[in-house]
Curated annotation (Swiss-Prot):
One GO MF term attached to the UniProt entry: tRNA-uridine 2-sulfurtransferase activity
Function: Catalyzes the 2-thiolation of uridine at the wobble position (U34) of tRNA, leading to the formation of s(2)U34.
GO biological process terms, semicolon-separated: tRNA modification
Protein species of origin: Porphyromonas gingivalis (strain ATCC BAA-308 / W83)
Keyword ATP-binding among UniProt keywords: yes
Class of enzymatic activity (EC top level): transferase
Annotated segments matching region Interaction with target base in tRNA: 93-95
Upper taxonomic lineage: Bacteria, Pseudomonadati, Bacteroidota, Bacteroidia, Bacteroidales
Family from the record: Belongs to the MnmA/TRMU family.
UniProt main location, coarse: cytoplasm
Catalytic reaction annotation: S-sulfanyl-L-cysteinyl-[protein] + uridine(34) in tRNA + AH2 + ATP = 2-thiouridine(34) in tRNA + L-cysteinyl-[protein] + A + AMP + diphosphate + H(+)
Record's protein name: tRNA-specific 2-thiouridylase MnmA
């Protein structure tokens, strides 16, 4: 079986190569270059260091290695999506789009199609049910990344391998140390993948500029401050508001009038909601309603996430004529339109897919 391994130079993907070779595979290693390299001088994440470490891994295990450039495609599909989503006053998820459109989209179209399987360092697993592959959660609940993979499709999940999905992060580090891998002590990457060391607000300002507006207290209607543009702020945000007498939280945004509405206190009611609405829902493996596993006339018990966190929340999913509605068992903070609601089974093991949040209340 021919296997392609997507390797970033970090400890996780390095251990992927180690484990594949231990199991008798000789994977072809690919490093995907995607980052901030344009005419104005924005620089990628530390790509040269990544490539150097990946080269060492490839040489050590005698694997073919190729650097593939998907920078143009990344800008066109992921960065442009991020900027446009923010412009509309919504909350983007570029990491989900990168997995769907770049790592398992463009790469597959240009290189991956030559291979039987594609292995990555994601913390996730797969289950085979009724002859079909399902995305499943990882052994390590803190590192689990199924929420970042919840926009991929059946063709993509059927081809993926997650060699470290059944390991804890501590076990991955231990394997890397025992094997003497050059990335064993390397820190995990943080933040949005294409930004590297660039400040998020600096990036947004570069494309959307500044536009001063009012910050208004939701309960009183009183103007309590100024902001530089609604696009710099997200629902649930607490830091960076420049307000005294807090804590203050962003609870609403008036896009047309460029107004940020805030509320004071650790958990004011205005921050929380129990209902999530989605116009569409993308199942990964198969539509559970069409397959007959779920009945659209009944509420379906599920667990879900609306942000990257180890915790799952229980709720009931409804399918109606105009979309999907999720009723949470408990109030949840910061339901942000534009973000994705990721749906799991009741045991939060199988990941069914995700839908973009259109409204929360």
């Amino acid at each position: 079986m021919d296997v392609a391994a997507l390797v970033s130079g970090g400890v996780d993907s390095s251990v992927v190569v180690h484990r594949l070779c231990e199991e008798g595979y000789k994977p072809a290693i690919f490093y995907i270059r995607i980052g901030m390299e344009d005419k104005d001088g924005y620089i990628d994440c530390p790509a040269e260091e990544d490539i150097e470490l990946t080269t060492l891994i490839a040489r050590r295990y005698g694997c073919p290695f190729e650097v593939v450039d998907l920078h143009k495609e990344y800008w066109e599909r992921v960065v442009s999506y991020t900027v446009e989503t923010v412009r509309r006053g919504l909350t983007p998820n570029p990491d989900m789009m990168c997995n769907k459109l770049i790592k398992f989209g463009c790469f597959e179209e240009r290189w991956g199609y030559q291979f039987d399987r594609i292995a990555t360092g994601h913390y996730a697993t797969t289950d085979l049910l009724n002859g079909k592959t399902y995305l499943s959660t990882a052994k390590d609940p803190v590192k689990d990344q199924t929420d970042f993979l919840a926009q991929i499709n059946f063709a993509q999940i059927s081809k993926l391998m997650f060699p470290i999905g059944h390991l804890l992060k501590s076990e991955v580090r231990a394997i890397a140390n025992a094997a003497g891998l050059p990335s064993a002590k390397r820190k995990d990457s943080q933040g949005i993948c294409f930004l590297g060391k660039i400040d998020y607000n600096d990036f947004i300002e570069r494309y959307l500029g500044k536009k001063e507006g009012r910050i208004i207290e939701l309960e009183t209607g009183k103007v309590i401050g100024r902001h530089q543009g609604y696009w710099f702020h997200t629902i649930g945000q607490r830091k960076g508001l420049g307000l005294s007498g807090g804590p203050w939280f962003v609870v609403k945004k008036d896009i047309k009038r460029n107004i940020i509405l805030v509320s004071r206190g650790y958990d004011p009611d205005a921050q929380y909601g129990k209902t999530i609405e989605m116009e569409t829902f993308d199942f990964i493996t198969e539509d559970a309603y069409e397959a007959g596993y779920w009945n659209r006339e009944d509420a379906t018990p599920v667990t879900f996430k609306i942000r990257h966190t180890p915790e799952f929340t229980r709720g009931l999913l409804y399918k109606g004529e105009k979309g999907y509605r999720l009723e949470s068992e408990e109030r949840i903070q910061g339901i942000a339109p534009g973000q994705y609601c990721v749906i799991y089974d009741e045991d939060h093991h199988l990941c069914y897919g995700s839908g973009m949040i259109t409204k929360g209340r």
